[in-house]
């Protein structure tokens, strides 16, 4: 019998007997474990060989045998739990231990660096599963970061300085305002072993043609081997950066036929997905990666939903006891914000917008927040920390305003905290706030209506590119804000848009109301090198490494 199964049987037997040695019979024990008398005898003999108990059998009708426990079920359970932790079997660990507080304590004690069989392993604790990693779909902040570790694109954007770099394409040139040419590397391999072909690249770029920022791509052809020509309907100075975004990452052309591709995707990036469940995401360095091989061999993201109720202060990479910690922090490039829905009567009413933005001002929200959140929140007066576009102007409550509807996407604890503060403030003004939580996909598509939406945005470098690109990619915003998005996109592509003025107009009309900038924090280990926090609150796994202990 496998060791894990035998351990489970012993723990069950120990629990049924309340850990007490006793006189009993094979029949009674077999009934406790719901097995045959013969199998029970085999179990007892095997457990005795392991030194867990002694079984002194007595022969004869009515005779009772002596069962003596030499090992406690708790000790064996702890040993089994340690084995499961080392094997990263978090789903089985949860089933074994049951108690969530105990599971959490065990997980936290094993966070950070691990060195096993010559491999460097990094363990991170996160509050929710990362089940959808499909480029081009609605991806949240953390999924966006993970996708960048799994996939490659024609170009890539340096997370630290926002500069454009080569990726699958080693060079590119603009032939004319409507014609770009990219030169691709040969010998690039997917995680499942197949070599990248030009058909994969063409199919990947054609599949995103329905997205607003890629809709001006009219034709994609390969005139010669490893050469790609892209033709446009309008000039686009940002095209090389667009092709480095997550939606434009390269998938195998057969991706739709591969099982569970969204949760177990296959790319050409530095890490390959090994496991992705509700309890754990495990990615492993790809030895055949065409760039520099990742220095951390394996990254395990352990999922513990219970930490969602704590202030989202960032990632904790706790190391061994006594090891000094390094803390890196930055104010996010983005903010939580209110979005008024012009499709509803109250959302479109300028008096309602003025009054709500006055009573739910950033300073009011921070003032009514608990201290643990006040330490992480900074009042926002623009979409970026450096902008001061919003002005708090006293406004009178509109006559007849008795209720409002606020909607946000689920699995985000701070949304609930902020919404609760808003509900409290509005109630003091005799206005009922009805709160709705929907899925992220529903939020992203924005097909349902709500007076107000509570959203958050994190913009990546370079900001003059990503800010408009991010807002334009969210259908919800286009439903709620009745401006000419296509005309604005054309001006943006031509470099004719003053982005600060454009955002200031959105804030001045109260279409968007900035609320809070959040401090992003990584609590790392002193032995970890190359850890540079990006604007998504994560760091590039492939560039980080562990320094050996001091001699």
Swiss-Prot record:
SUPFAM superfamilies on file:
Periplasmic binding protein-like II
Keywords tagged on the record: Activator, DNA-binding, Repressor, Transcription, Transcription regulation
Chain residue ranges for the region called Solute-binding? 163-492
Segments of the chain annotated as binding DNA = 26-49
The processes (GO biological process) annotated in the record are: negative regulation of DNA-templated transcription; peptide transport; positive regulation of DNA-templated transcription
Respond yes or no to whether keyword 4Fe-4S is given for this record.
no
- Where the record annotates domain HTH marR-type, the positions are 1-116
Q: What domain of life? A: Bacteria
- Matches recorded under NCBIfam families: PRK13626.1
Q: What is this protein called?
A: HTH-type transcriptional regulator SgrR
Q: Which organism is it from?
A: Shigella flexneri
């Amino acid at each position: 019998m496998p060791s894990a199964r035998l351990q489970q049987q012993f723990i069950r037997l120990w629990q049924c007997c309340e850990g007490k040695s006793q006189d009993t019979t094979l029949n009674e024990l077999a009934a406790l474990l719901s097995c045959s008398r013969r199998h029970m005898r085999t179990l007892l003999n095997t457990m005795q060989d392991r030194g867990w108990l002694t079984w002194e059998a007595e022969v004869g009708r009515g005779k009772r045998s002596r069962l003596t426990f030499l090992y406690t079920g708790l000790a064996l359970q702890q040993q089994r739990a340690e084995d499961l932790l080392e094997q990263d079997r978090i789903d089985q660990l949860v089933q074994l231990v049951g108690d969530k507080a105990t599971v959490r304590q065990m997980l936290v004690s094993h966070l950070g660096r691990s060195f096993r069989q010559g491999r460097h392993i990094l363990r991170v604790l996160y509050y929710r599963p990362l089940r959808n990693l499909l480029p081009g779909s609605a991806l949240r902040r953390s999924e966006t970061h993970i996708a960048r570790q799994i996939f490659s694109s024609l170009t890539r954007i340096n997370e630290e300085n926002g500069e454009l770099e080569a990726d699958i394409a080693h060079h590119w040139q603009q032939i004319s305002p409507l014609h770009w040419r990219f030169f691709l590397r040969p010998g690039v391999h997917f995680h499942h072993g197949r070599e990248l072909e030009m058909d994969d690249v063409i199919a990947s770029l054609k599949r995103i043609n329905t997205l607003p920022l890629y809709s001006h791509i009219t034709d994609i052809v390969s005139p010669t081997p490893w050469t790609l020509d892209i033709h446009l309907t309008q000039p686009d100075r940002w095209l090389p950066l667009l092709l480095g975004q997550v939606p434009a990452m390269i998938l195998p052309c057969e991706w739709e036929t591969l099982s569970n591709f969204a949760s177990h995707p296959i790319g050409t990036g530095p890490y390959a997905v090994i496991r992705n469940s509700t309890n754990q995401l495990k990615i492993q360095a790809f030895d055949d990666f065409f760039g520099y091989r990742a220095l951390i061999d394996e990254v395990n993201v352990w999922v513990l939903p219970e930490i969602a109720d704590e202030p989202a202060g960032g990632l904790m990479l706790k190391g061994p006891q006594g090891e000094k910690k390094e803390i890196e922090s930055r104010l996010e490039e983005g903010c939580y914000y209110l979005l008024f829905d012009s499709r509803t009567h109250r959302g479109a009413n300028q008096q309602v917008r003025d009054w709500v933005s006055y009573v739910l001002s950033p300073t009011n929200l921070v003032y009514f927040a608990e201290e643990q959140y006040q330490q992480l929140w900074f009042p926002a007066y623009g979409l970026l920390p450096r902008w001061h576009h919003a002005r708090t102007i006293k406004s009178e409550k509109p006559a007849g305003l008795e209720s409002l509807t606020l909607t946000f996407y689920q699995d985000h604890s701070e949304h609930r905290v902020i919404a609760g503060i808003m509900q409290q403030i509005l109630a003091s003004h005799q206005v009922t706030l009805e709160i709705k939580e929907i899925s992220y996909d529903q939020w992203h598509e924005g097909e349902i209506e709500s007076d107000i939406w509570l959203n958050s945005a994190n913009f990546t470098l370079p900001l003059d590119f990503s800010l408009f690109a991010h807002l334009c990619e969210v259908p919800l915003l286009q439903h709620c804000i009745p401006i000419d998005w296509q005309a604005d996109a054309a001006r943006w592509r031509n470099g004719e848009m003053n982005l600060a003025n454009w955002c200031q107009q959105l804030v001045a009309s109260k279409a968007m109301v900035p609320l809070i900038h959040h401090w992003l924090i990584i609590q790392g280990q002193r032995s970890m090198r190359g850890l540079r926090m990006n604007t998504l609150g994560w760091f590039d796994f492939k560039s980080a490494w562990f320094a050996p202990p001091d001699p």
